[in-house]
Amino acid sequence: YSTIHKEFNITTERTWRELNGEPCVDMTPEETEKKQICCSRSFGEMIKTLDGLTKAIATFTTIAARKLRKQNSCASAISVFIQSNRFRNDMEQYSNSAIRIMEESTADTSMLLNAAIKALESIFRHGISYKRAGVILSGIVNDTLVQPSLFISQDKRERRNNLMKIIDTINASSATHDTIHIASYEPVS
């Protein structure tokens, strides 16, 4: 070992050590936080109503927010997208998306849901049969790095964060993972 160290450069030394069974490069993958979280689905039956799409978007937002909190992160924006069945040329084709920037980066399901519903309402068109929809959370940062808003009190922020933790704990212990959900929607299975 000392001869190799004296005679060759560090790359050659590491190669020699690796060939002799001594790992020199850490091969364990680092767990990186996601830069975006997407939750979407194609529907078995097409959805024609705003109410039907609202329930689907609410479910997707709830799932995405749960993933966000699981990695101790917050999102500064939420995008909603909807599209008709592109394989059905006999039907009117439509796809659109909208993004809402949050007042403050958050992982609060109700705040994200309010923004998602507003985005959905801005792009929904009556008379279209929708086949696919989804949400994308972006602008993701670690929850310790969130720039607080001047318009949201620290006390309110802490209460909301504690509420989300309690809801996640209860839901994690249930078989369906949606024992407790936002009252304005029913989870879509």
PLM features: residue spans?
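DNA-contacting surface of Y-family translesion DNA polymerases
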Residues: 1-129, 145
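Acidic, metal-coordinating catalytic segment for phosphate/diphosphate chemistry
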Residues: 94, 101-189
